[in-house]
Amino acid sequence: EVNEMVNFKTGSVRRFFVQTERPGLGDMTESMAAHAHREIDPASEVETSVGWCGFWDERVADPTQFDVNLVGFGFRVDTLKVPNAVLAPKTRDACEALKQELKLDSLNRQQIADVRAQVKQQLRLRIPPRTQVTQVVWSEDEKDVVYLMTGSDAVAAQFHELFERTFD
């Protein structure tokens, strides 16, 4: 697959030229459902979730048939990461509280690491994931072209990997 980027005044579009033939809408829906976006469990250590979603609705993985040769769908990336600007002061406060509770002058590295892990886990339960949805259009007109509406190399790489797992 070849990845080209075209810049516009308000955004970028990447074109992927695919060798595989586009499946029918029913087969495409089935393939996308197998790799649909899944919510991140805040109790887990997972920080990123990547999957397909709808063109208009990020909660479902249904492709939209625009005309005979164009099908649109979404590529969704969720990231659940506690910002260090939030984690550091909360960890300091929790360490101070633990020192007072245990009547200690200081905590050792292991105690600080344990407090940091507990604070991070508590914050993950309260902080919503950052969601990024990128529209995708698959055209059969010119050499089976897939358009990805992004200028980000990282998003393009994640898309390419998921696309190959789903449709190859």
Report the location of each language-model feature.
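N-terminal alpha-helical "arm" segments
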Residues: V2-M28
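Surface-exposed, low-hydrophobicity interaction/linker segments
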Residues: G26-Q135
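Short cationic amphipathic helices and targeting signals
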Residues: R14-F16, F73, E142-T150
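A short alpha->loop->secondary-structure connector
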Residues: A154-D168
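Generic structural motif
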Residues: E21-P23, R76-V82, D141, D153
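Short, flexible, solvent-exposed loop/turn segments with mixed acidic/basic and small polar residues
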Residues: V2-F8, P63-T64, R130-E142, E161
